[in-house]
Amino acid sequence: MAMALQIIASSSSSPTITKSHLFSYPPLQSRYKASKPNLSSWFSLLGSSRFSPYIGLKHLGISISPKSSNPEKKRRCKSMMIRASLFGVGAPEALVIGVVALLVFGPKGLAEVARNLGKTLRTFQPTIRELQDVSRDFKSTLEREIGLDDISTPNVYNQNRTNPVQPPPPPPPPSVPSTEAPVTANDPNDSQSPKAYTSEDYLKFTEEQLKALSPAESQTEDQTQTQEPPQPTTVQTPTGESQPNGTARETTAASPPRQD
C-alpha cells in the first residue's frame, strides 16, 4: 500500500514518468528478487512426484477429495443397495410403512394382520418357489441364447472377412446367328478346303447318280435274260399226252400215215 501511495504521489507531482524511473525503482526490484527463492522452494517441495492440481490447494490449506473413477466400486455399491432392499423397498420406506400401519390398525390389529400375512405366505410358499425356479430357468435359457448369438455373430463376421463374397459371373453374350457357311475339317492331303454345296449342286449330283444307275440296271437285265435257258414247247399228241416240241416232230416223222 505504501508503494502504491508513493506512486500516486509521484504521479500527482509530475504528470510524466519516464521508463528509466520505473525500472530503477528500488522496492520493486527487491520484491522481485525475494520472490525467486520462494518459487524454487515450491518446486523442491514437489520433487520428482507427479504434479496434480490438488497439491497446490493442499499447501494453501484447502483439501478436496478427488472422485474415484473405479467402475468396480460403483457396481459393488449398487449391488449392496439392491441386496439391502426387499422387493424394491428399502429400510426407510419399510419404517414409514410400519409407522402408518401402527397408526391405522393399532397394536392389536397390527399383530392380527401380521399373523394373517404369515399364514398366507406359508400357504403360497410352494407356489413362490415354483415361480422362482421357472424364472431361473427362463433366465438361464435367455443367457444361453444370448451367449450363442454373441458367439455366432463374430464367427460369421470372421468367415465373411476370410471368404469375401465373390461377385456373380457376368452373363454370356447373346448368340448371334452366323451368316457364314460352315467350314468342314481340312484333310491333310487336300491343299484347298472344300466349299459348301448348294441346292443346285445336290440336284446335279442326284441326276448324275440316276443316269449312272439306269444303264447298270439295263445291263443286269440283259445278263439275266441270256443266262436263262430256253424252255421247250409242249405239243399235245392225238392220244392226249403232252410231249415236247422236238419229240412230237420225231414221232410224226417216225409214224407212218394211216390207211383207211
Swiss-Prot record:
A single GO BP: regulation of response to water deprivation
UniProt key word Nucleotidyltransferase: no
Name assigned to this protein: Sec-independent protein translocase protein TATB, chloroplastic
GO molecular function: proton motive force dependent protein transmembrane transporter activity
Region annotation (Disordered) ranges: 146-260
Topology feature Lumenal, residues: 84-85
Any Pfam family matching the protein: TatA_B_E
Compositionally biased residues, Basic and acidic residues: 201-210
Biased composition (Polar residues): 152-163, 186-196, 240-254
Any single Gene Ontology cellular-component annotation: chloroplast thylakoid
Residue spans crossing the bilayer: 86-106
Biased composition (Pro residues): 165-176
Transit peptide: 1-83
Family named by the database record: Belongs to the TatB family.
Domain of life of the source: Eukaryota
Keyword Ion transport assigned: no
Source species: Arabidopsis thaliana (Mouse-ear cress)
